[in-house]
Structure formats: structure tokens, C-alpha cells
């Protein structure tokens, strides 16, 4: 099964969970500190909420969840053939899951991932969960973007 993923930055995770639970008449499929996702059947949507205070209501990234690693690898080949620069992450841990994925960047800077979940993880991943840092320095977030801290 394939479905579109929409990852949103939210100021208040609990308020966002309450709102989206009511909107889609569904409970989160996964809930961790600073993170939640919904696996909506109709319309087919993976909604990801990332608590990033001060950036609420903004897009974090977009994606397409696919059913297998073979599909991710086929997309890597297709996107490369189409002349798009790709960033591959195979067996990476991100968003409390081990995943195979490929990233591309749209002309407006919007980040898209094509990914499959291999297994759940108890850790968020190699990058910090939040875009903000206490010292205002840039930090890597899960989607590979460099984000500047709230005071920077």
C-alpha cells in the first residue's frame, strides 16, 4: 500500500493530537515524546506531528510511504534516471522507526521522501527531534534539513 505523508511542525503536541484525532476520527498509531503519527485509512494519509515550539503550523516535509524496500530501490533508480539528485538512507533510524528511504528536494526547497518502515524503534534517530537548540546553532533534523535554532 502506498499513501502520502504530511509531516507538520506543531507548537503543542497534545493540542495537535486532540485536533487531528477529532478531524480524522482516529487515534495516533504511534506516540512518543515530541512525536506522533496517524495512519489514516480514508483518505490514505500518514500524518506526522513533530513538536517544534515556535514553528507550529509549518511544513516539516512531505513523503510517500511505500510497501517494501524493493519499491524504495525502484524509486531511487527512477528518480536518478529522471535527473533528480537523490539522497539515499538505507537502514536508517528516523521518527522512531528503522527505514529505507530516498530524499529529493523540489524547486521551492520542499523536501520529499519515499520510504518504507522496516521496524519500530525506541529511539527517534540520529538527529535531534526538535529543530530548536538552546545555543541558537544550526542542527540537523531527521529529514536532513539544517534548521536554525529559535534564538538564531
Swiss-Prot record:
It comes from the Bacteria. It holds the Pfam family Glyoxalase. Residues 2-117 form the VOC domain. CDD domains: VOC_like. Signal peptide: none annotated. GO terms for biological process: response to cadmium ion. Induction: By cadmium. PROSITE patterns: VOC. InterPro entries: Cadmium-induced_rsp, Glyas_Bleomycin-R_OHBP_Dase, Glyas_Fos-R_dOase_dom, VOC, YqcK/CadI-like. To B.subtilis YqcK. This is Cadmium-induced protein CadI. It comes from Mycobacterium bovis (strain ATCC BAA-935 / AF2122/97). The gene is cadI.
Amino acid at each position: 500500500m502506498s499513501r502520502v505523508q504530511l509531516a507538520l511542525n506543531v507548537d503543542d503536541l497534545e493540542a495537535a493530537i486532540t485536533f487531528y484525532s477529532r478531524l480524522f476520527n482516529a487515534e495516533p498509531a504511534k506516540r512518543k515524546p515530541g512525536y506522533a503519527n496517524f495512519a489514516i485509512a480514508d483518505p490514505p494519509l500518514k500524518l506526522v506531528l513533530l513538536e517544534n515550539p515556535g514553528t507550529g503550523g509549518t511544513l516539516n516535509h512531505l513523503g510517500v510511504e511505500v510497501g517494501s524496500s524493493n519499491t524504495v530501490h525502484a524509486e531511487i533508480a527512477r528518480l536518478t534516471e529522471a535527473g533528480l539528485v537523490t539522497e539515499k538512507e538505507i537502514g536508517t533510524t528516523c521518527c522512531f522507526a528503522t527505514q529505507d528511504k530516498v530524499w529529493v528536494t523540489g524547486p521551492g526547497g520542499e523536501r520529499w521522501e519515499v520510504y518504507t518502515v522496516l521496524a519500530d524503534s525506541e529511539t527517534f534517530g540520529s538527529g535531534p527531534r526538535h529543530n530548536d537548540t538552546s545555543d541558537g546553532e544550526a542542527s540537523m533534523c531527521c529529514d536532513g534539513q539544517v534548521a536554525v535554532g529559535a534564538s538564531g
